């Protein structure tokens, strides 16, 4: 029997506000344990939450970017549960009326076709703290993350393969990043994914029993975990067994999923309206203000790069996959850089350097200004493409002007015939045996002089000019 895969994804995205959702404490990642906390985060008696307007701004932008309807009458709810990283014993979230609902996003499949994936809801909530279980037998609680604003985006169960799930996450990450509401860095926990997967016989409308997957710390692991689950569940069903509703985690080392717990029923969180936060309304004017702040999104940028800048579909897709790279490219082209040359450098030498150094484009000293200047001095013959690679490394590590560095470092190409011709004559004088071979008609004897000339100029001779002049002087030599 053949089965159809049914996948839905729940994605938590940390919003990049300066402060937390209900307290004025910094929401910055990476500070010392419990440094970003105050009495609200610790849930001291009598303290009250105050909603951060920037969080609602981000929620509106997310809903608009994901083609969602908005609930204009906003309220929050209490989700009741006890855990050490949740000192209030409840989480402030949204239950029956999320900020956004009934949305969709378009994904591109491997065969070049597109598909719309429905988005059921997007709701705002606060994050919990972090538990760490030490080897000393103690458990430690860090509440820096407590109260960091989240938006949870819940897809419809519209994906039919792990590849579609991967494409959905890629598209979602791009949209969220371009909207400017999160850096969506999975390695820092600002984007977290849970997957729900079930199988059903082809033609059956009713969903099968779903399994929830956790510990998916990269898009690649989401795909691998889902691929394993497809195989595991199919084997159980084909052998006459039944799938249990359970939560499993992905084991990256063994590329399998491991049982965490069996779900015997839906958790009862006893939601009720949050009494400490008043109801409020999102006005049409507020929505339109947020709409005007949304940028051009990846799909539109890709189309423009192809139609207006003459880039290939591949180049346009690579450049727009990351907003930082795309914005860098935009600035470089606006400064007069040739679009194809800027694209080639960003996808070639720049990408290789970043991978080797383990850094991002924001973490190096290269700027659109000095990259364009470097491309300009390649095009005008000041330096060769070979020398440019060395210049780029210097700019990436130290910044500064490309032309200034080249001149100080003595890397300027020699293109003046008045300088090159005497050097060529000296090369002839210093290599009499090679001259004799050339005059006698020995095959390929002329090629040796290219190496002699480049050595004599320490590689600074402009290859095009030098080869032309060398051919000219060799012709004269043969006549004599």
UniProtKB/Swiss-Prot annotation:
Allows the formation of correctly charged Asn-tRNA(Asn) or Gln-tRNA(Gln) through the transamidation of misacylated Asp-tRNA(Asn) or Glu-tRNA(Gln) in organisms which lack either or both of asparaginyl-tRNA or glutaminyl-tRNA synthetases. The reaction takes place in the presence of glutamine and ATP through an activated phospho-Asp-tRNA(Asn) or phospho-Glu-tRNA(Gln). This is Aspartyl/glutamyl-tRNA(Asn/Gln) amidotransferase subunit B. Heterotrimer of A, B and C subunits. The keyword ATP-binding applies. Belongs to the GatB/GatE family. GatB subfamily. It catalyses: L-glutamyl-tRNA(Gln) + L-glutamine + ATP + H2O = L-glutaminyl-tRNA(Gln) + L-glutamate + ADP + phosphate + H(+); L-aspartyl-tRNA(Asn) + L-glutamine + ATP + H2O = L-asparaginyl-tRNA(Asn) + L-glutamate + ADP + phosphate + 2 H(+). One of its GO terms (biological process) is glutaminyl-tRNAGln biosynthesis via transamidation. PANTHER family: GLUTAMYL-TRNA GLN AMIDOTRANSFERASE SUBUNIT B MITOCHONDRIAL AND PROKARYOTIC PET112-RELATED (PTHR11659), GLUTAMYL-TRNA(GLN) AMIDOTRANSFERASE SUBUNIT B, MITOCHONDRIAL (PTHR11659:SF0). It comes from Streptococcus pneumoniae (strain 70585). GO terms for molecular function: asparaginyl-tRNA synthase (glutamine-hydrolyzing) activity; ATP binding; glutaminyl-tRNA synthase (glutamine-hydrolyzing) activity. Keywords: ATP-binding, Ligase, Nucleotide-binding, Protein biosynthesis. InterPro entries: Asn/Gln-tRNA_amidoTrfase_suB/E, Asn/Gln-tRNA_Trfase_suB/E_cat, Asn/Gln_amidotransferase, Asn/Gln_tRNA_amidoTrase-B-like, GatB, GatB_C_1, GatB_Yqey_C_2, Gln-tRNA_amidoTrfase_suB_CS. Its EC number is 6.3.5.-. The keyword ATP-binding applies.
